[in-house]
Amino acid sequence: MSNTKEILEKYNIKLDTNKSQNYLIDDNKLNIILENADIQDNETILEIGAGIGTLTLPMAKKAKKVIAIEKDPIIVDILKQQIIKEKLTNIEIIKDDALKVDFPKFDKVVSNLPYQISSPVTFKLLEYPFKKAILMYQLEFAKRMQAKPDTHEYSRLSVALSYRADTKIIDTLPPEAFIPKPKIKSAVIELIPKNNKPIDKLLDNTIRALFQHRNKKAKKALIQSAHELGVDKKVLKQKLSNVTNDLFEEKVFKLTPTQIKEISLILEGNL
């Protein structure tokens, strides 16, 4: 929003990049986000890290309701004044940490996420039912979200997310699109949840154990991270000595999400 700089200057606000306070100032990029969100007048939109309302205000003009989460009390006061100025009555502000509050019911989530909480807030969102998310991340993080096996970006995040959602990069943003300029490029991701049953704890623990040693063979990685499975190393080594499945001899970064799920099922039968 072109007047973002003016608002910050008016209230003498110095943004803190250590708190991921990088505000979008490129109107073209803002419009791309709004177009892809495809907000309808019967939808409730959740926004995490609302800031001074760059996304909040235009979304509220389209949506039934916007739930805006922002934990900085000074920024919240400015947001409230912007809402009054625009004469909007369908915005609920939650002044709190997004990782510590329960989210009210919502249809879509549209946010310029604070980058330092990208991973935990994404997985928290996926515990709730919703139609679609349009979210901004660091570009490198966005690439890891949708990385394929046997690539440099393939990670625990790639696998854990693949069971829960379909993702695609719909736009990239240079540092100049923000104030202050971050040191990295950013990306806008479309995320569509999969309506699967919840991921079981053993599978999540298996992913975590494997990717602590992504360049090692699966069996060795699991043994070295046996604590993640709640098992003693020696006990796990003995149990896995009876397993002959070739997947356990494959390097972790080459395993597909389907193969990792198979490994988890084998572990379930042996632990």
Curated annotation (Swiss-Prot):
Alphabetically list the UniProt keywords: Cytoplasm, Methyltransferase, RNA-binding, rRNA processing, S-adenosyl-L-methionine, Transferase
Q: Where in the cell is it found?
A: Cytoplasm
Chief location of this protein within or outside the cell? cytoplasm
Q: What is this protein called?
A: Probable ribosomal RNA small subunit methyltransferase A
Please explain the role this protein plays, according to its UniProt record.
Specifically dimethylates two adjacent adenosines in the loop of a conserved hairpin near the 3'-end of 16S rRNA in the 30S particle. May play a critical role in biogenesis of 30S subunits.
| Organism lineage string | Archaea, Methanobacteriati, Methanobacteriota, Methanomada group, Methanobacteria
The family this protein is said to belong to: Belongs to the class I-like SAM-binding methyltransferase superfamily. rRNA adenine N(6)-methyltransferase family. RsmA subfamily.
Task: Report the EC number(s), separated by commas if there are several.
Answer: 2.1.1.-
